Amino acid sequence: MAQNKPVKKIVLAYSGGLDTSVILTWLKDTYGCEVIAFTADIGQKEELSGLEEKGIKTGASKVYIQDLRLEFARDFIFPAIQGNAIYEMRYLLGTSLARPLIAKAMVEVAEKEGADAFAHGATGKGNDQVRFELGVKSLAPEKTIIAPWRIWSFGGRSDLIEYAKSKGIPVPVTAEKPYSMDRNLMHISYEGGILEDPYKEPDEKMFLLTTSPEKAPDAPEYLELDFEEGNCVAINGKKMNPLEIMETLNTIAGKHGVGRVDIVENRLVGIKSRGVYETPGGTILFLAHRDLESITIDRDTQHHKDKLSIEFAELIYNGHWFSSRMKAVRAFITETQRYVSGTVRIKLYKGVCSVVGRKSQVSLYNPEMATFEKEELYNQKDAEGFINIYGLPAQETARLRKK
């Protein structure tokens, strides 16, 4: 068992909340070794000042706080958009994309500090335990992984509070939310508590990123998004880096109530779970990018990519970001993006994001071929021979079975 394997130094994924504060102290008590706390800024908008001091007071030998927002946008969110990654046709994978980045950063800290173990606060019923641990196994297979929620005897929040008080750990005085929330640059997810009844509508006061569509502006807003090789590089002609793109689109789309989704998804561990998500900027990018592909990628390649996008999303959701299969899938996706450059015009209005225009210097759309007016490039008479050959299997099957 993990708790019986001797370890010398642990890197803990640390938020400063009740769970990871208790875990920090519990690790020191259980393993009698040095614990380094690691916090990633991935756009969660939480107050990070004072976190280092709190971690040290709770028992950490060091506290790392790293700003990973640009890397998250550039190396994780944007590749997911290029691959049209959407799990079960609804979920844009905000949480799933963040976990491998955090695992990667923790491995780098462990190598720098000579740590031989990792710990996290993910529960034994969720997907995050898999994502964290597969990331570590892929990047540092020799390291030990400690998952306290699968080891200790604490049953819930009340047990943690009692333990924290006994150890002098500051307990947050804020009221517990009636649901769990996870926020980053891509989205906010809400799960559990009052949301466990899949028929109950969420309280409007829950939403933080998006305005209620009913209260959104009465006039639509138009945006022009410029893409180069599948990546958004400018909004309304203004060049921006991936972090700036995400922050700008989150603000604009949120104002118009765009990006809410309420779903029941299939977790990797076999449980069905209700999730409510706000993904304003990601929703715009997903729709705009896929639309631009429609005029810049040929039919057969696009159809194959659409099929592969399902597998791509499942690989992300299931924690396989660093796997060999993921590398192969991403290589195909990257090749398809060579000509996905152009401009997409978006209309935002009361919760709806609509593509209303697209153009590209490398477009495969030929109006002279598509026109219903006078034809010069397309001879309709050619269709007869094509249909005769294309329909031959169906025709012969029907003819022979009638005998």
Swiss-Prot record:
GO BP, sorted A to Z: argininosuccinate metabolic process; L-arginine biosynthetic process; urea cycle
Main subcellular location: cytoplasm
GO molecular function, one term: argininosuccinate synthase activity
Keyword Cytoplasm tagged: yes
Binding residue positions for L-aspartate: T123, N127, D128
Alphabetical keyword list: Amino-acid biosynthesis, Arginine biosynthesis, ATP-binding, Cytoplasm, Ligase, Nucleotide-binding
Pfam families: Arginosuc_syn_C, Arginosuc_synth
Top-level EC class: ligase
GO annotations of cellular component type: cytoplasm
EC number(s) on file: 6.3.4.5
InterPro entries documented for this protein: Arginosuc_syn_C (IPR048268), Arginosuc_syn_N (IPR048267), Arginosuc_synth (IPR001518), Arginosuc_synth_CS (IPR018223), Arginosuc_synth_type_1_subfam (IPR023434), AS_cat/multimer_dom_body (IPR024074), Rossmann-like_a/b/a_fold (IPR014729)
Pathway: Amino-acid biosynthesis; L-arginine biosynthesis; L-arginine from L-ornithine and carbamoyl phosphate: step 2/3
Compartments, as annotated in UniProt: Cytoplasm
Stated family: Belongs to the argininosuccinate synthase family. Type 1 subfamily.
Full protein name: Argininosuccinate synthase
Protein species of origin: Leptospira interrogans serogroup Icterohaemorrhagiae serovar Lai (strain 56601)
Source lineage: Bacteria, Pseudomonadati, Spirochaetota, Spirochaetia, Leptospirales
